A protein has these predicted regions:
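N-terminal interaction/assembly modules
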Residues: 1-113, 117-120, 124-133
Length: 133
């Protein structure tokens, strides 16, 4: 299902927040999804895609961790918000249809919005290294 660029950007922002909550609270994604539906029901986002990606991240979190580990970066030392951004990016790389440059650009944008000012360099290095494997 295709969505427009602006809606896709907003969806990724909400997805990062939902994944952060999943990682922080170790909470079932169906509960997180229900909460986000209530909070964002009047916004123009595709809740079906949000649910699908959130479930994919939950079900494939070990695969995503293994993919990040292949880059020789210690997943346990990555800040939680950066880990959430990486989970969204790696889900799109491994299971999605987006071109890799788009995934990298979006991870950088999300990092600049949600994380510390220099995190985007670190995230870019991890994603770039994985893509080149």
């Amino acid at each position: 299902m295709k969505i427009n660029f602006k809606a896709a950007k907003k969806l990724r922002e909400i997805l990062v927040q939902a994944v952060y909550q999943f990682l922080f609270n170790n909470q079932d994604t169906s509960e997180i999804y229900d909460q986000f539906v209530k909070e964002h029901q009047n916004k123009k986002i595709d809740l079906e895609i949000l649910n699908s990606k959130l479930r994919s991240i939950e079900l494939n979190s070990q695969k995503i961790d293994q993919a990040i580990d292949k880059t020789d970066f210690d997943i346990s030392k990555i800040d939680l918000i950066d880990k959430a951004i990486l989970y969204v990016a790696f889900e799109e790389i491994i299971f999605g249809e987006l071109d890799h440059p788009v995934v990298i650009d979006e991870a950088i944008r999300l990092s600049k919005k949600f994380s510390n000012p220099d995190s985007f360099k670190f995230l870019n290095a991890i994603i770039d290294k994985y893509i080149k494997l």
